[in-house]
Amino acid sequence: AWLPAQALAAGSLKAANSKARAFIQQAMQEHRIPGLQLAVVQYGKVVLLENCGFANVESRVPVTGKTLFPINSATKSFTGVAMMQLVQDGRVDLDAPLSRYLDDVPATWRGVRIRQLLGHTSGLPEIIDSQGAFGGATEPEAWSAVEARPLEVSPGEQFSYNQTNYGLLSRIIVKLSGQPYERFVTQRQFDVAGMPSTTFGDSYDLVAGAATIYSV
């Protein structure tokens, strides 16, 4: 017997979505995740959209489609896109040294290539430690402290994920665009993509509709 391709596709999608839901429920239980949002996009179309669990466990506030979640280091994706937009604008060369764009960095940092910052192969020391900003509570103090440390390895030698790389990229974006990082990303990405609920802030901000942050 022959079944129309559309019917087969619909059946396969339904089965895949069912497996995705089961996987998410299992992951939430195993990792003690109180709540999350899930979206699956296939060929530019949303094929699964789920709101699971609670935004606030104590008050039993459910996650909805309007619940806001902090995305933390996923923000690096926006920084990477912003840098590539500057490349397309002819403002940035990925193979250029850091010193071409920032003249106030240590001598040992000056030869690091932009693509090495993007790919976490710069060899630069980490500006964030287990207590937060390295060397002090303020950003200038943290930069002063980390700039006094030696390179961990030679640039391009190995991958080492850290915050220093993308902090420097953010400074380049600010310098070349002539506007705050947040405004550049909002205008060039969020506004273009139709993301009005995506914004910037820190962990001390009180944001209406935001999920409570929990740690295990």
Language-model-derived ranges and their functions:
Residues 69-72, 159-161:
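Catalytic tyrosine of NAD(P)H-dependent dehydrogenase/reductases that use a Tyr as the general acid/base
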Residues 51-57, 109-216:
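Short, surface-exposed loop or secondary-structure junction motifs
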Residues 11-71, 93-96, 139, 148:
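Short, conserved catalytic-motif segment at the N-terminal edge
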Residues 2-10:
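N-terminal twin-arginine translocation
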Residues 94-108, 192-193:
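Short, glycine/proline-biased beta-turn/loop segments that scaffold the active-site neighborhood
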Residues 76:
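Short, conserved phosphate/pyrophosphate- and ester-handling motifs at nucleotide-, phospho-/glycolipid
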